[in-house]
C-alpha cells in the first residue's frame, strides 16, 4: 500500500475523517489533519491495532508435513529378497516471533553496540594518554641533561655523554610505553642513533599511528552500517509479522518466500550472537592482540595483501525472485519449458495436473497451455511462431521487389468428370490433348498459357474424378477466376458441387460455362435451376454470376467466354511486381529418366530466370533449365506464366510454394527446418498411441491388412491415390500403404514387397530391368495402371477376397408329423405330410414343438412308401426317422441349409 492522506484513507474504508483521526490517535500515532500523509508503516500499525481491538487472534504457528515413499530390498530368513515399501514422514513447525521479544532483542543489540563503541573510544584515549606522557618525560629528560652539561667539559666529551644519556633516557621511555598494555618486553642492547634517525623514527611512528586510527575508524563505520542494515531489516520483518497471518502469506505468487527470509535472518542473528559471545572475552586479551593485528594489517596493505576482515561472513539480504522471458513455440516439450523457467520439470507437471492435463516431462503441450503455465509461475511468456525462419526469409525477399505491372489472369477450369473441361481448353488452344489422355479423362493438373486476341490467359485444367479433390482445391487456391463447366445434358453432379465449394472457400470469382449445347438433349434451364440450389444465380436469372452457353465440339460461345474472362480480369485489376525475386506455387512434380526431378510451377510475383536458386518445399537447387508447356526452352518467366524447371534434388509436394533466394546458406537452413518438421510430424503420426486408439484396437485380433506399395508418375496423382486408398479401409480390412513414391519401380521396391507381402502397383510408371528380374525370381506380380478407375476397382476386389464370408440360413421345407409308429430298425418313426418346400434326406433338420425348437440334428431315414428316397416334395406323404430323438404327433420337421455368401467392399 502507498502513502495516503487521512481523507483518502477515510474514503477508502468508507468512514468519516474524524473517525479515522480518532483511530490513529488510539493506535498511538500522532494527530494529523485531513490532508496530512499516513505512511505505509503507519497504515500497517493502524491495521494491526484494529485487528487486536476487534479480538482477532494471530496464528503464530504453521506446520508443514511431507511424506516420501521408497522401496527397499530386504533379505528374509529363508534367503529370499523381497521389496518393502518404506514411508518417511516429516513435519516442520514454523513459529512467528513475538513482536515484543523482537523489540527487546533489537534494543539489546543496540545497547551492546553502544557499549562496544564506548570501550573502543576509551581504549583509544588511553593509548593517546600513554603516548603523550612518554613524550613529555623524554622531553623533560633531554632538557635536564642539556642544563647539566652546560659547564667546562670539552665539546667532544659533551657530545658523547649527551648521546649516551639520550639513548638511556630513550630506552627508559620506550620501556614505559610498552608497560601501558601490561606486557613486559625483554631489554635489548641500546643502539646509538643520530638526530636524523631519531626524527625519521618519530615521523614514521606518527604516520603509523595515524594510519591505525584511520583504519580503526573505517572498521567502526562499516560495523555500524552493517548493524543499521540488519536492524532495519528486522524492523521491516517485525512490521510484517505484526499484522499479517503467516498462513495467508504462503501465496501462489511467492511460495515459502517469507519462510526463507525468516530462516536467513535467524541464521544471521545466531552467528552475530556467537560473535558477541566470543567478543565478550577479557579486554586485556583483546588489548594484547589488537596492536599486533593492526601492525600486520598495515604491512599487508603495503604489500598489496587482503585483510582478514574481508573474508569474514556478513549477512546478505535475500535476492528477490528472477523473472524470465520465456519464448514459447507452437508446440513445446514440458522439460524444455521447465528449463527455460529455471525450475524442475516436476513442478510444471504438478501445475498441469491441477489444470486437468496429465502429461509427462517428455510430452509436448500447445502454446496456449504453456503460456498459462509461464504466467502462473510468475514469468513473462513470449509466443514465437515456428515458421519464424520462413517468415524472415519471406520479408527479406519482399523488400527487393518493385515495378508493379498488370499481369495476365490465371483461370482454372473445374467441373465433373466427362463434362468437357479439357475439350473446352483444346478448342481454345486448337490442340487435341484430351484424345491423348488415358481413358479420355484428365489425371493431372495441366497448366497452359494462351495468347488470344484479347491478351494472354493462363489456364489450369484440373481432373474431375472424385479422387482428385486435393488437386482441385490447389487449383482453386492458385487461380484468379474459376470456370465451372456443366454439361447441358447431365446437369449438376457431385464434383460440380465440390468445385463450387472450393471456389467459395478461396474467394475466387466464378464463371459458369454450360457445355454440350450442340446435343439434342441439352437442357440449359434445368442446369440453371439446379445451380440456384447451390446459391449460384447467373446474370440471366438476375444474379451476379456471368454465364456462357458453349460447345467445345463446334466452338459455339467460345469467344463470348473469353470476353467474360477478360472483362472479369479488368474488374479485378490484377497486378504483380515484375522485378525482384520470383515467387509462386508448385503445380505438379515428377521424376523423369535422364532429367531427374521436374517441377511444374506457376510464377505469381517477380521474374524467374535460369540459374536462380529456388527453394521449393523441403528442397532447394539452381534452375538448370526451363521449358514451357510445349517443351520449348525459355530463359525467364514472369507473373502468371507456367513453366517446368530442372535442378531440384527431389520432387517437391504439389501445392507447396517456391521462392527464389540469394543466400544458399539461408535456403539450406529453411529447407532443413522444413524437412525436420516433416519428419517430426511423420514420427508423431506413427508413434501416436493414445488411450482412445488403444480402446479402438482392442478386440480387433481378426483384423486383416492389405499391404500396398504404390509408385506413380507425378506427386499430385500420388497424393490423390493415397487419399482414395485410405478411404477404402473398413472395420475388417485395412489398406496399409507400406511405401509410396514418384518414379519408376526399382529393385528396392520389389525387395520390400517380398519381405512385407505387399501388392506392388504402378500408375503410369514401369519397372526397370533389375526390378523385373527380381520380381520374376521372387514370383511377385507387378500391376500397371493408367486409369484410376482400374486401380481402385482391383484394390476393392483384393479387399473383398480378404473378407470373411457371410453365412445365411435358408429353409428348404417343412413337414408335419401326423402319426408315430415303432420300427424294429429305427425305433420311433413318423408319418409326415410335406406342407411346404422339399424335404431332403442329407440336410440338417429342426424339430419344432409348439413352434419352439426342441431338437436340431440329422434325418436317419426318409422313405416314400417302402422305398428309400433322397427328397419328398410339397403335398406328398413320407415316413422319416430322426437320429437320436423321438418325435411326437403334432411336431413339425423343418429342413434347412447354411449358405456362404462372399461379401464385397
Swiss-Prot record:
Q: Where is this region: G2?
A: 440-444
Q: Which GO terms describe its molecular function?
A: GTP binding; GTPase activity; translation initiation factor activity
Keyword Protein biosynthesis part of the UniProt annotation: yes
Give yes or no: UniProt keyword GTP-binding.
Answer: yes
Which residue intervals make up region (G5)?
A: 551-553
Q: Where does GTP bind?
A: 415-422, 461-465, 515-518
User: Where in or outside the cell is it found?
Assistant: Cytoplasm
Family matches, as Pfam families: EF-G_D2, GTP_EFTU, IF-2, IF2_assoc, IF2_N
Give the region (G3) as residue ranges: 461-464
Q: What is its main location?
A: cytoplasm
- What is the primary gene name for this protein? infB
What HAMAP family does the annotation carry?
IF_2_B
- Give a short account of what the protein does: One of the essential components for the initiation of protein synthesis. Protects formylmethionyl-tRNA from spontaneous hydrolysis and promotes its binding to the 30S ribosomal subunits. Also involved in the hydrolysis of GTP during the formation of the 70S ribosomal complex.
PANTHER family reported for this sequence: TR-TYPE G DOMAIN-CONTAINING PROTEIN, TRANSLATION INITIATION FACTOR IF-2-RELATED
Cited PROSITE patterns: G_TR_2, IF2
- Name a GO CC annotation attached to this entry: cytosol
Keywords, A to Z?
Answer: Cytoplasm, GTP-binding, Initiation factor, Nucleotide-binding, Protein biosynthesis
| Positions of region (G4) | 515-518
Q: Compositional bias of type Basic and acidic residues: which residue ranges?
A: 116-138, 190-230, 269-278
**Homology family:** Belongs to the TRAFAC class translation factor GTPase superfamily. Classic translation factor GTPase family. IF-2 subfamily.
Give me the ranges of the annotated region Disordered: 52-84, 116-230, 269-318
Full protein name: Translation initiation factor IF-2
Q: Where is the composition biased (Low complexity)?
A: 165-178
